[in-house]
A protein has these predicted regions:
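A short, well-structured beta->alpha microelement
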Residues: 45-66
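Short, charged N-terminal beta->alpha structural module
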Residues: 20-48
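A short, gly/pro- and small-residue-rich
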Residues: 82-105, 153-161
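Charged, low-complexity C-terminal accessory regions
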Residues: 17-21, 28, 140-179
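Bacterial N-terminal signal peptides
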Residues: 2-13
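Structural recognition of alpha->loop->beta junctions
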Residues: 120-152
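Ser/Thr/Gly-rich flexible loops in soluble cytosolic domains mediating phosphotransfer, phosphorylation
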Residues: 91-124, 166-179
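Hydrophobic beta-strand scaffold residues
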Residues: 52, 109-110, 161
């Protein structure tokens, strides 16, 4: 009985909606892994009238105090990385440098994974792990978390995680995170 209660408490907190708006505006949106999922999240931010600047390859030195939140669209695409002329190793280094700079600037960080199972695997997970560890909040399409990977990372990082059924449902919790 105690184990069941503990499981429900841990799982419930991992899937808890972000109840308090915490993220400042404007935001910077970037693609971690260079997948086309970036474009979908861009549309959702626009629809929800969240002011943001979109830069797929922004580097740490491109972050400044003018933006208050870093939104990371995670999911590796070999085609996207190739088109951007960047290796997975260079993308991981860029990601870690971005996260370090965001912390220095006291920016809020939101990780978004909308690619489902197709944007999982070793390459994507190497990018997802540091993003989740440095995030304040995460939103995931449920099909990308069927194995509980994001749930475990969110619990380890002690951050809220919202799971939605469809990409179109990401907009509401994403907008609600902004004050």
């Amino acid at each position: 009985m105690l184990i069941c209660a503990l499981f429900v408490a841990v799982l419930g907190s991992a899937f808890a909606q972000q109840t308090t708006a915490f993220a400042g505006k404007p935001a910077i949106l970037t693609a971690i892994g260079q997948s086309a999922d970036f474009e979908m999240v861009k549309v959702l931010l626009t629809r929800n009238k969240i002011p943001f600047k979109a830069e797929t390859l922004i580097k740490a030195e491109g972050l400044d105090s003018a933006s208050q939140t870093l939104v990371l669209v995670v999911g590796a695409s070999t085609k996207g990385l190739g088109a951007a002329g960047i290796s997975i190793e260079a993308e991981l280094a860029r990601t870690k440098a971005l996260l370090k700079r965001a912390k220095e600037l006291k920016m809020s960080v939101i990780t978004v994974h909308v690619g489902g199972a197709a944007r999982r695997g070793a390459m994507s997970e190497s990018l997802i792990e540091p993003c989740m560890a440095s995030s304040d909040y995460a939103i995931v399409v449920a099909s990308g978390n069927e194995d509980g990977f994001f749930t475990k990372l969110a619990a380890k990082a002690n951050i809220g995680l919202t799971s939605v059924e469809r990409i179109s449902a990401v907009g509401a919790p994403l907008a609600a995170a902004f004050k």
